[in-house]
Amino acid sequence: MADKQISLPAKLINGGIAGLIGVTCVFPIDLAKTRLQNQQNGQRVYTSMSDCLIKTVRSEGYFGMYRGAAVNLTLVTPEKAIKLAANDFFRHQLSKDGQKLTLLKEMLAGCGAGTCQVIVTTPMEMLKIQLQDAGRIAAQRKILAAQGQLSAQGGAQPSVEAPAAPRPTATQLTRDLLRSRGIAGLYKGLGATLLRDVPFSVVYFPLFANLNQLGRPASEEKSPFYVSFLAGCVAGSAAAVAVNPCDVVKTRLQSLQRGVNEDTYSGILDCARKILRHEGPSAFLKGAYCRALVIAPLFGIAQVVYFLGIAESLLGLLQDPQA
């Protein structure tokens, strides 16, 4: 991508279009990932991704799977635009006379892109997680209350589905956080977000660039769109699984509400220690399957939109209406 000069407006539009399409397609899986990652040892509301989605639809309706989607759809455009544009910018700055970047320079470009995007990613994830996890917490409390009543009555436990949870809004959450904690409230978990997104970009962008290059026919200037899509999917899923332990820690730290008897954390190291001590090493892979399913098409779509140059075509039509 270093040899392909694209205007900044086109980069921003391409990133925004890709983000909107991707989030709309995979958001329910992202909701399942958040709820599974936040489950600690003890009362488990969901046993798997499919179980989570089924119970969510039964108790909260179809649109319950899209709780928090409005936040993502609003902020994913600047987030993805910053990420893709920053990576392209750093690759261009690090390249010399259009020569292929070394692996180290590709990793540095990815590191720069991951660092830039957290400006938007951290508050977006902070709000989204509260909205996504509200149903899980309400469901857990309902089940525990039902178990307590049955124990007192000596009865057998029935199947209890998740209830309709209170519905906080992103506006309400933002107002409460700003009032109680200031701007720092929206950036809770910033360190953990950097710990996830910088390594992700360091893995993703070099891997994508090399996979995309391998699939490019020698006679063509750029790879076919399906090669870009597959390269984005493979690189995205590989990077997502690689940094999933950091994502688990970030999700736990950014969750403001806790279920019954769930641990609280004072920081990244405290969170990692408690997860390892109380839940074992496998807990760091919670939601990894969901995250791979989310990231693969998300970045596959992003790269297809980016490499097809949809924004360039739109801008060209606007500049030359007779074309």
Curated annotation (Swiss-Prot):
Solcar repeats: 6-93, 101-214, 223-312
GO BP terms in the entry: aspartate transmembrane transport; L-glutamate transmembrane transport; malate-aspartate shuttle; monoatomic ion transport; regulation of insulin secretion
Reactions the enzyme catalyzes: L-glutamate(in) + H(+)(in) = L-glutamate(out) + H(+)(out)
Record-level Gene Ontology MF annotations: amino acid:proton symporter activity; L-aspartate transmembrane transporter activity; L-glutamate transmembrane transporter activity
Keyword annotations: Disease variant, Epilepsy, Membrane, Mitochondrion, Mitochondrion inner membrane, Repeat, Symport, Transmembrane, Transmembrane helix, Transport
Signal peptide: none
Function: Mitochondrial glutamate/H(+) symporter. Responsible for the transport of glutamate from the cytosol into the mitochondrial matrix with the concomitant import of a proton. Plays a role in the control of glucose-stimulated insulin secretion.
The protein's name in its UniProt record: Mitochondrial glutamate carrier 1
Species of provenance: Homo sapiens
Gene: SLC25A22
